[in-house]
Amino acid sequence: MENDRLLVLYPQKRGSEKERARLDEVLEAALDGIDAEIVENMDLLEQDPERYRGRRLLFAVPLGKNGINRGYYEVLAWLRGGEQVLSGAVGGMIIDAESEFYTKATARELAVAANRAGCAFVGRPLVEGTASLDNYLIQAAHS
């Protein structure tokens, strides 16, 4: 059934291979055996806004080393457009960066914008990968 399929919003996937290699690997493992559609063309957001309502969504955002992803800003602008484009949707996030910075700020910004657009984030919806992955050591120590 189309509405049961997980939609993965993967902006700016066309970045350098190095920038997206780790996130591609994570998604390949995480989505193994899951009926998912990866949306790489952010122009599709505007073309069929009804498509995302009531859906299961995964935002996969590669930030590179400078914390900038132009495609992500297209998603952010769409979410902030004032309509409930994600009404009834449930989401999660994977934010990856080649530096130790920007992942939490991006996740907060995305969570607020998506929530205002109608998307719920349940439990611990964020997987955050900094360059060194040291944040996983801290998380493991607190578990």
Where are these regions (language model features)?
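FMN-binding flavodoxin-like domain, especially the glycine-rich phosphate-binding loop
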Residues: M1-S143
